[in-house]
Amino acid sequence: MQKIFRPFQLTRGFTSSVKNFRQWRLIETRKIAKQPNYQVGDAKPLHMPKERKKFPDYKYGESNIFKQSNKGLYGGSFVQFGNNISESKAKTRKKWLPNVVKKGLWSETLNRKISIKMTAKVLKTISKEGGIDNYLTKEKSARIKELGPTGWKLRYRVLKRKDEIENPPHKDAPIIEMAGGKKAKIYYDEIVNGSPRKISVGRRRLMSFLYPLEKLEYRSVGKDLNYKKFVELFADVPVKDILARLEDHKFDLSTITV
């Protein structure tokens, strides 16, 4: 009996698994330079950063292949290259860009609108997750990979703000009842120039009282002091010293004391 042997042919399956694997590989192989971990007492390095880092380092760094994805939520999508093949087998080089849209999405945690570029796929995922906050804060490793540098920074801001809301700085501050039945919260209990002071306002309010007084003092000697420089000067100053400084400027501390 004669057997008929058909030639072996490879058929291409209609699947995106190979494409997705290639995109994840482009993310996972990215690396960032190892940053030195400075400790108190270490020798002063030759290069000192000009300012403190505002965000933690993103594990997968920035993309050098599709750089515009570093400034939006692209979900790990990259530009794809290939060929258009005509009936005469002529190949024409072509590239396919992700479907990018610019949207303004409301963040409940940050209480503001976030305007950012994203792919249509990411926008659909955000709708499924129930908002951009849920999308950014999901703990899955795949979500961290697809966030990118910009998404990582937004995630840090959302998580930081959530922690501030859940754990305010004066959450356990004592509340006392005054003579007229009015209640007041004691933010600080300090001794200023030998006198005990129970302060009823927070640090931000104290800084707002001190800034115009410091600005006048700078102006008296022919110098200028803007608010940014003022915040840098007093960012790490203890509250006790801020109160002492206010008293040096003849500020009446009794107006903020109970």
From Swiss-Prot:
A GO biological process held by the record: mitochondrial translation
InterPro entries according to UniProt: Ribosomal_bL28, Ribosomal_bL28/bL31-like_sf, Ribosomal_bL28_sf
Cellular compartments per GO CC: mitochondrial inner membrane; mitochondrial large ribosomal subunit; mitochondrion
Protein origin, superkingdom: Eukaryota
Summary of subunit composition and partner proteins: Component of the mitochondrial large ribosomal subunit (mt-LSU). Mature yeast 74S mitochondrial ribosomes consist of a small (37S) and a large (54S) subunit. The 37S small subunit contains a 15S ribosomal RNA (15S mt-rRNA) and 34 different proteins. The 54S large subunit contains a 21S rRNA (21S mt-rRNA) and 46 different proteins.
Assigned protein family: Belongs to the bacterial ribosomal protein bL28 family.
Protein name, per record: Large ribosomal subunit protein bL28m
Organism the protein comes from: Saccharomyces cerevisiae (strain ATCC 204508 / S288c)
